[in-house]
Amino acid sequence: MKLIVGLGNPESRYIGTRHNIGFSAVEKIAASFGANFSKGKGKSLEAKITHRGEQVIIIKPMTYMNLSGHAVVAAMNFYKIVRNDILIICDDLNLPSGTIRLRAKGSAGGQNGLKHIIESLGSEEFARLRIGIRVDETSLTSFSSFVLGKFSENEKVVMEKILPITSDAALDFTINGIEHAMNNYNKPVT
């Protein structure tokens, strides 16, 4: 059994924001299997799918980004899932838009949802798939305004291209593991 977690914020005002791309990614995965989200363990919504014989639990924490670890730990405890079998999908301000980056472990890199998950698990050793949201290299006056802002029309086009690839990468992880997914998907989307 695997656990895929998409990070975002629960209120409707956050739909379509850069910070909620993790929610968009897991919604795409669930929809491709005809699965719907319902009340999950802890403060989350969850969907269940089976991919090539592997049961996969997909969750969207409803705790706000900065407290995502609570929902992750609740799902891991209930389903008895170990850290090696979880994948966290989130936005990354440090990656250019149109890029995904999978890692087997690592720091939060300034992503507060990842930071709380690391604190809650007491470890940086879990897989994550970061979706680049950085549009250009100009300095931002407010990081929070940018990540909580809606995608521009051009950015939406890029995200529409990247979400199916993100879905494929996450599903590759569930069957073949993080190393295989990293080798196949750590490249810019064209």
UniProtKB/Swiss-Prot annotation:
Belongs to the PTH family. Its EC number is 3.1.1.29. It catalyses: an N-acyl-L-alpha-aminoacyl-tRNA + H2O = an N-acyl-L-amino acid + a tRNA + H(+). It is found in: Cytoplasm. Monomer. Its main location: cytoplasm. The active site is at H19. It is an enzyme of class 3 (hydrolase). GO terms for biological process: protein quality control for misfolded or incompletely synthesized proteins; rescue of stalled ribosome. This is Peptidyl-tRNA hydrolase. Pfam families: Pept_tRNA_hydro. TRNA binds at Y14, Y64, N66, N112. It comes from Pelodictyon phaeoclathratiforme (strain DSM 5477 / BU-1). InterPro entries: Pept_tRNA_hydro, Pept_tRNA_hydro_CS, Pept_tRNA_hydro_sf. Keywords: Cytoplasm, Hydrolase, RNA-binding, tRNA-binding. The lineage of its organism: Bacteria, Pseudomonadati, Chlorobiota, Chlorobiia, Chlorobiales.
